[in-house]
Every structure is written in C-alpha cells, then in structure tokens.
Amino acid sequence: MFEELKKCKTFKEIYTILGTKPFEKAAFVLVLLWVLLPAWSCAEHFYWGIVGVNTMQKNYAVEAGYKIAMQLVGSLSLVFVCIYLLGRYVMNKGQILQKIKNEPWHFCLLAMLLWSCISTVLSDDIYTSFHGTDYRFDGLQSYFYYAAMYVCAFIVANTKKNKVICNVFAAVATLASLIVILQDFGNPFINQCFVGGPRTAMFFQFNHTGYYLNLGIVCLMGLYLYEKRLWLRFYYALSLAFQLFAILVNSTFGSYLGSFFAMIMIIIFFYRKVRKFDYKPLVVVAIFFLISLASYMGYVPTSSGQDMKVNLQTLFADTSDILENPLEATDAGHGRMTLWQQGLKMIPRRPIFGYGPEQLDKELSEIMWVDRPDNEFIQHAVFLGIPGLLFYLGALITMFIRQWMHMRKLESTALIAAGCVIAYLVSSLFGNSMFYTVPYLYMFLAFAGGRRGEEEK
C-alpha cells in the first residue's frame, strides 16, 4: 500500500487506495480514548493522592490534567475529522447532499455549530465564549471537540466495535460508581485521593457524577436487553444494580429521573424491534424497582440525607407549589426555579444570536452563586439565541422520527444509544453541560443515528 501511496498525485487517488477501513479503525481508537478519559482522571487522582501533595495543589493538578487530556484527544479528533471529511468530499460530492437529505439531523447539528461561531463573535467577552471558563471549559473550542467526537462515533459503523465502546463506557461508569460509594462510606485512602467533595468520584461536582452515572445505567440496561449469552447478562444485571445503588448514594435526583424515563423508552424500543414477549425487560424493571424501594425504606445510606422518600416528597411539594403559583415557587428544584425564570427573562433581550457561550455569570451571580440556568435547553437559548435552540431540537426531533419509523431495522447499539440520549436529555432539564459529560451525549447521538439494515449475526 505504501508504494502505491507514493505514486499518488491527487487526493482522490490517495483516498481510493486507503478505502474506509483505516478511517473506521482510527475513529474507533479515538472514541475509545474519549470514553477512557474518566479512567485517566481516576489514575491521576490516585497518583496525586499517593504522592501526598496538599489539597489545593492536588485539585489544580487533577483539573488541569483532565482538561489537557481532553484538549489532546479533542485536537486529534478534530484533525482526523478534517482529513476524513476532505476525503468524503473528494470521493462523494453528491452523496454528501443525499446523506443530509436522508438524515437531516446532521444539517441541524452543523447549523448549530456555525450559529455558535456567530454567537461567539458577537459576544461581549469573545475570549471566554471561545475558551470557556476555567471551571467548565465549555466554550466554542470545546463545541468543536464535541462535533469531532460526533463524527468519529458516526464513522464507527461496525456493530461489534460499537458494542465494545458501550461496554468500556459501562465499565468506566462502574469504576466511578465504586469510588462514589467508597467516598460516601468514608474510606480514608479514597478520600485522600479524591478530594473534589463527597460523592464526586473523578469529576468536579457530585451532580456532574450523577449525569455520568445516568448514562452508564441506561447503557447497561440496553446491553442486558440485547445480550444472548447468560453469563454476560448476569454481569450486566449485577453492574446495573451496583450503579443504581451508586446513583442513589450520589443523590442526584434529576439523573435518577433520567434513568427512569429512559428505562421506559428503551423497553418500548426493545418490544417495537423484537415484536414478541421477552422476560428480560421485566428483569430490568425489577432491579430498578427493588433498588429504588430499598432507598425509599432507608436501606441505601447516603451522607446527603436525601433518600428516595425525601426526594419524592420534595418533588411532589415542588410540583404542587409550581401549579398553585409558579411565580412565587422560587425555591422549587432546590432553587432552580429562580434560575429558570431568570434565564427565560434573558432570552427576549437577545433572541437571535444570544449572549454567546459562557455569558451568564454577570446576570446569575447576583441571584445565586452560579453561572448556568440549570437547564440545558434554556442555556442553549440564552447562549445561542432561539435559532440555536431550534437547531438543537430539530436534530433531536428529526432523528427520533426517522429512526422510530425504521426501528425494526436498527442495530441494537443504535437503540441502546437512543436510550442514553433520552436519559441525558431528561437529566439536562435540571443540569448543566460540562466538558467531561457533553462529549458522551454526542457519541450516543451518533450511534443512535446509526446505519439501518445491518442486522447483527
């Protein structure tokens, strides 16, 4: 092959000789690197914990290390995607337009990215909008990394490779679950290594850990439903129970709700695909119900003091307050209602291009010491304007409709990923985007929009 490549005089000749397999293999490796980033951060925590530097130095080193690793993998992905797309353009100019016509969500996501560029240029603080804040690292630069992750995941067309990625993701999430539990139970060595706060694992805040575990739980549900080998189903069931226990210890109720609604949808997807009764969804529901019941009865200890009973009481009380007087229910959702109201007030002031990424600190810090509205849909509308939100919704809606119509022909990994996307979207109603959670939304989104007609053997 190398001798043939030396003789090439045009890009078309180079891409003709290479074919698609080298690109798919490279994309697979890059997606795996993305998925392993939390494990890398975990190793960093252990290293600095063993070295024994003070807490401030340790936090700085770990946060900087995670961001540098993400930048490295993101930059490699971005360069690879540029090379890949150049080849696609040279080889299949007409097919690209046909692809967008058949799968319009690609156009919506591209339009959202381009709109983000305009919003950044028109921002009052272009530097912060481009680079993001020191804490969240979620500016335009990271948006391009997310886009690269999406394309890389989309390139991985092989079902077995997709399953490997899902399995690795679930395994890393199980590792995070173990650390959350050991942190909350007061293990001295773990608390010496992981000093971000209680129930945070390798992330910066316990809620962010909940967003991540939410995806791991639904991924395991899907892997269990579509697995034929008994020993693997047993492993997935145990891991699922363990992660459910961990997310209740973590006590991020919005993420728990994401897992609950995603469980319902992923079971609907399963029966719509197989078109016959199967007992496996009942096992998933039983595991979810029993672990939740244990928490409700006080058998899942958590230092937060917020078990299932407390969370449900709070949910019903907040819902009642909102229905009675939404303007006065400012404490609903642990104060999120105030942030939602303020975010909604900001949208009409800059409805077209928004304020730009990461431009809420001045507005929200006067109300509460935060810089996000704790709702990613409101966040998109404020940052990118109403068109930016519509592009985002357009991608989600068109993908859902298109894939729903062809569900029987979809690969199992596409349906697993669709459940993970739903889990993320539900939890995002109460949460924030972070540089270490958003990439996995776009990874699963790419898998959910996967190829049809390639049944597994």
Question: Whereabouts are the PLM-identified features?
Answer:
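Membrane-interfacial, low-structure loops and terminal tails that flank and connect transmembrane helices
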Residues: 1-21, 90-103
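Alpha-helical transmembrane segments of multi-pass inner-membrane proteins
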Residues: 2-5, 10, 19, 26-40, ...
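Hydrophobic alpha-helical transmembrane segments in multi-pass integral membrane proteins
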Residues: 54-116
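Extracytoplasmic catalytic-loop and juxtamembrane helix elements of membrane-embedded
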Residues: 56, 129, 188-202, 304-327, ...
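Short aromatic-rich membrane-water interface segments that cap or initiate transmembrane helices
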Residues: 58-70, 129-144, 196-209, 372, ...
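Membrane-interface capping segments at transmembrane-helix boundaries
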Residues: 90-91, 451-457
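Membrane-interface helix caps and helix-loop-helix hairpins in membrane proteins
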Residues: 128-133, 248-253, 429-435
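TM-adjacent membrane-interface loops and short helices in multi-pass inner/ER membrane proteins
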Residues: 205, 307, 315-370, 377, ...
